[in-house]
Design a protein with these regions (language model features):
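Short loop/turn segments that flank or connect secondary-structure elements
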Residues: 1-207
Length: 207
């Protein structure tokens, strides 16, 4: 049975790419470069901006001086050229919450992340038990991007980015489709019942 380009599951329009494409982050190779590259910050909601502001004192010392300066001047988020609310950035690309593991990083010191790896300061605080909020949902769901339509309808699209080529290769080697790689974030965003239905649709089409 051939799969349709777009499927509707509940109030969510799902691109079939999340079933057919493989993906698994390979931080040993990419070092978390997705937090650095790009011409805009990560998409955020107003509620998420509030969560970030609440965590700011906790993560402040992990931020670069340049990032602190940007936040002092314009806050933790801004509206980009497309009209989307996104996290503030430094030098036209780095998210202000970018920080790095040490060159002597170990599983005990940096949660198993490789040395010199970029990590979100918000997630670092969460992993250390200093904050109850992890990071923006748009970051957790990457490489899926969420598009909000009217009437409560949202769309999920697979975003292809050249810097994630190692994640695609690892996903292919391990045979992990995008929707399985992002099981946790998808459940967090849409719920267990919705994800179960998503898996049933995938199985129906042989994925």
């Amino acid at each position: 049975m051939s799969i349709l380009p777009i499927l509707q599951i509940g109030d969510v329009l799902v691109s079939s790419d999340i079933f057919t494409e493989k993906f698994c982050c390979d931080l040993e190779k990419c070092k978390g470069v997705c937090c650095v590259e790009g011409d805009a910050g990560a998409p955020v909601t107003l509620d998420e901006v509030g969560e970030i502001e609440n965590a700011l004192d906790i993560v402040w010392s992990d931020l670069s001086a340049s990032a602190q300066s940007v936040i002092d001047k314009q806050g933790v988020a801004y509206t980009d050229q497309e009209g989307d609310l996104v996290t503030s950035i430094v030098h036209g690309k780095n998210c202000v919450f970018t920080c790095y593991t040490s060159q002597e990083s170990t599983s005990e010191t940096d949660g198993g992340l490789p040395p010199g790896c970029c990590i979100c300061a918000l997630e670092k605080a969460f992993r250390a038990g200093k904050s109850k909020w992890r990071k923006p949902m748009s970051c957790a769901l990457y490489p899926i991007r969420v598009k909000v339509f009217g009437g409560g309808l949202v769309g999920l699209n697979y975003n292809r980015w050249a810097i994630c080529k190692d994640a695609v290769l690892k996903g292919e080697q391990l045979n992990i489709p995008v929707y399985k790689f992002l099981k946790g974030p998808l459940i967090q965003r849409f719920g267990e019942a919705w994800y179960t239905e998503l898996c049933e649709v995938a199985e129906q089409f042989g994925y």
